[in-house]
């Protein structure tokens, strides 16, 4: 059966993506007062954050190596469930901690942490028992993780370091899909197990009745549902309409938008980051529909965020021409790499 990305799936996934970005930004506005500027926070100001950043990078490298080994040699289910449990507890803890602090700003840290942990564990227990609400849980954990990383790296190191980190993730995503080739199998395993690592939408689309595309008799006989078979006989060829978006694809734009606001207090810059991310997601979907292969989402998102940042730094006050030029160059280089790679893939598929 043919697979494609339908209009309803595009609207659904784009809506969830943008809702997550705006919720993440709205949650930090009451809780954090910006205390740094782009200029005075270009280098680390807090010694504790240096240790956090170092171990954060080490953790990422270890996770990548473990994932590669697991996908190659491990055929069980326990590892994926443990990884899901860790992500749910980690992300949802900071989500509920920020949310409760917004509602009850006078609450002490101990009851705040205890309540947040209890809700996180309850959410995990629900997911384990019923294995439902994947999209909602993924959004909650992505928002929480985005706020946590944006706060620690953004405030501790400044905008340029945070921007560089997102760029490194874009490079990693590119390598994981096109070079190391373990990200697509990992996404497939996560989808098959319904793990809270991604949001997605899947539906059955049918061609219009005037379509010339018709299913063969032997294919029609394979459809066990009599109602669906009746519709397929009169409406043309059914196709699976599906799209998936990983939690990292949701978290990283939010990390940059949230961190940028917490550093400078410039809401316009954060809004431009989110707008660029939305445009990047639409561009990614366009590429998916055109090339019909699994693609990394973070590189296009990063390219369009950089392009919109370049414009933002030119028109915002105070203006920053140097950052505008830097992000503009990064956007052009990123898009060039994407187009060259896809052109090679398209040429290879044509030759085959």
Q: What do these predicted regions represent?
A:
Residues 1-352:
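A membrane-topology feature that recognizes alpha-helical transmembrane segments
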């Amino acid at each position: 059966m043919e697979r494609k990305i339908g209009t309803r799936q595009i609207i659904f996934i784009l809506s969830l993506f943008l809702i997550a970005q705006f919720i993440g930004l709205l949650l930090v506005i009451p809780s954090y007062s910006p205390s740094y500027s782009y200029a005075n926070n270009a280098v680390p100001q807090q010694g504790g954050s240096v240790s956090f950043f170092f171990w954060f990078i080490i953790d990422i490298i270890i996770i990548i190596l473990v994932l590669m080994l697991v996908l190659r040699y491990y055929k069980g289910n326990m590892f994926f469930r443990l990884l899901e449990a860790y992500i749910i507890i980690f992300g949802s803890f900071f989500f509920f901690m920020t949310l409760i602090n917004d509602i009850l700003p006078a609450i002490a840290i101990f009851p705040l942490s205890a309540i947040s942990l209890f809700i996180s564990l309850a959410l995990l227990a629900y997911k384990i028992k019923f294995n439902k609400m994947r999209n909602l849980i993924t959004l909650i954990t992505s928002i929480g993780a985005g706020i946590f990383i944006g706060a620690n790296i953004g405030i501790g190191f400044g905008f340029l370091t945070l921007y560089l980190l997102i760029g490194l993730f874009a490079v990693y995503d590119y390598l994981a899909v096109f070079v190391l080739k373990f990200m697509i199998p990992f996404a497939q395993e996560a989808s098959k197990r319904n793990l809270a690592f991604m949001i997605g939408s899947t539906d059955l689309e049918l061609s219009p009745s005037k379509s010339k595309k018709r299913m063969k008799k032997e294919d029609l006989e394979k459809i066990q549902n009599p109602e669906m078979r009746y519709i397929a006989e009169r409406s043309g060829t059914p196709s699976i309409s599906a799209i998936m978006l990983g939690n990292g694809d949701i978290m990283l734009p939010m990390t940059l938008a949230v961190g940028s606001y917490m550093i400078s207090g410039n809401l316009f810059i954060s809004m431009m980051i989110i707008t660029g991310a939305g445009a990047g997601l639409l561009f990614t979907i366009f590429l998916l529909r055109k090339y019909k292969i699994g693609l990394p989402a973070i590189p296009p998102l990063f390219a369009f965020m950089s392009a919109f940042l370049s414009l933002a730094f030119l028109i915002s006050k105070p203006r920053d021409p140097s950052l505008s030029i830097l992000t503009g160059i990064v956007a052009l280089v990123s898009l060039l790499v994407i187009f060259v790679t896809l052109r090679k893939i398209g040429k290879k598929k044509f030759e085959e």
